Design a protein with these regions (language model features):
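Cullin-RING E3 adaptor/co-adaptor recruitment helices
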Residues: 193-313
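Zinc-coordinating Cys/His ligand positions in small cysteine/histidine-rich zinc-finger domains
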Residues: 2, 26, 78, 101, ...
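Leucine-rich repeat domain C-terminal region
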Residues: 46, 50-60, 64, 123, ...
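Conserved "Asn-ladder"/turn position within leucine-rich repeats
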Residues: 20, 43, 72, 95, ...
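WD40 beta-propeller repeat fold
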Residues: 1-23, 27-31, 37-44
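Leucine-rich repeat
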Residues: 1-4, 7-11, 21-27, 31-35, 47-63, 73-79, 82-87, ...
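Conserved hydrophobic beta-strand positions in leucine-rich repeat
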Residues: 13-17, 35-40, 64-69, 87-92, ...
């Protein structure tokens, strides 16, 4: 930043230095106590010293509301940014991020978070601890699954997940009753997931545990070792209303399409106690087709009715 900026403009509120080739912001930034919007996208920030030391203690840490650092070279979210507690909008799209730090939860005033166009592979559950978040953009990454905790974002209005590696959504996402926009295009969704489903037969311990639970065999803690008592307490009920069985470690994963907001049919994950609890149309197609084959060949191995109502964006 130019020297003397804070002396010439002590009451500066908006600063746009986008596309100027900046490699570091400089100490001048710390002397702008009224700054609430900083736009520094499409630069070369991201190396050591890109952000001034002491940023989290500067008046800026309290005044800044909007920060856009998209189109730079950050490989991680700078820890100093996680101390800007007044931020309402943070954009770090088009960088080189490989993850989202759990401390993102410290930005509890955040309403808009843009992390699209990076190399993010996972979403930390802590992201769900942003009570004011309304717009979450995670498109064009390498995300394979959505943590069920994300359903705790009760203020969320827009969720962009297109062009990732998602094969299914947790059923908890149905709790996002205020969601108005959901983008999922460009994800594998159920195509390859259904093809690759496998079922591991239950162990003898699991078979015995299922018998005890389904037939209500009485037992007392003194009858069994503590480890088996704990094991029996971990039984999960099969969601098939015609079954009434339970499972422990061995289960069948099934995709079920569920109405969402009255507009879409989304593929959600269900866990069943055995393949017999799956409908004939929901059993996995055990294809040995390689990952390198085209999506059109993948789709041919999945019943058409499974794919025709998947939300694409």
């Amino acid at each position: 930043l130019p020297a003397g900026l804070s002396q010439w403009f002590p009451a500066l509120e908006v600063l746009d230095v986008s596309g100027t080739g900046l490699t570091e912001m400089g100490m001048e930034l710390l002397s702008l106590p009224c700054l609430h919007t900083l736009l520094a996208k499409n630069n070369r920030l991201g190396g050591p010293g890109s952000l001034p030391k002491g940023l989290e203690q500067a008046p800026l840490a309290r005044s800044l509301r909007v920060l856009n650092l998209s189109g730079n070279r950050f490989s991680e979210v700078p820890p100093a940014l996680l101390q800007l507690r007044g931020l309402r909008s943070l954009s770090l799209g088009g960088n080189r991020l490989h993850g989202i730090p759990p401390d993102i939860q410290e930005l509890y005033s955040l309403e808009f978070l843009y992390l699209g166009g990076n190399f993010i592979t996972a979403i930390p559950p802590e992201l769900a601890k942003l009570p004011s978040l309304r717009y979450l953009v995670l498109c064009d990454n390498k995300i394979q699954s959505i943590p069920p905790q994300l359903a705790q974002l009760h203020s969320l209005r827009s969720l962009s997940l297109h062009n990732n590696l998602l094969t299914y959504l947790p059923r908890e996402i149905l709790n996002l009753v205020h969601l108005e926009e959901l983008s999922l295009r460009g994800n594998p969704l159920v195509v390859r997931f259904v093809r690759d489903l496998t079922y591991n037969p239950p162990s003898l311990q699991e078979l015995a545990g299922r018998t005890v639970k389904t037939r209500n065999v009485p037992y007392a803690p003194s009858d069994l070792p503590d480890s088996l008592v704990r094991y029996l307490s971990l039984a999960s009920n099969c969601p098939n209303p015609k079954c009434g069985g339970v499972y422990f470690d061995s289960c069948v994963r099934q995709i079920k399409f569920v109405d969402f907001c009255g507009k879409y049919r989304l593929p959600l994950m269900h866990y069943l106690c055995s393949p017999e609890c799956s409908s004939p149309f929901s059993s996995a197609s055990q294809s040995s087709t390689s990952q390198s084959e085209s999506d059109s060949e993948d789709e041919a191995s999945v019943a058409a009715h499974r794919m025709q109502k998947v939300l694409l964006g």
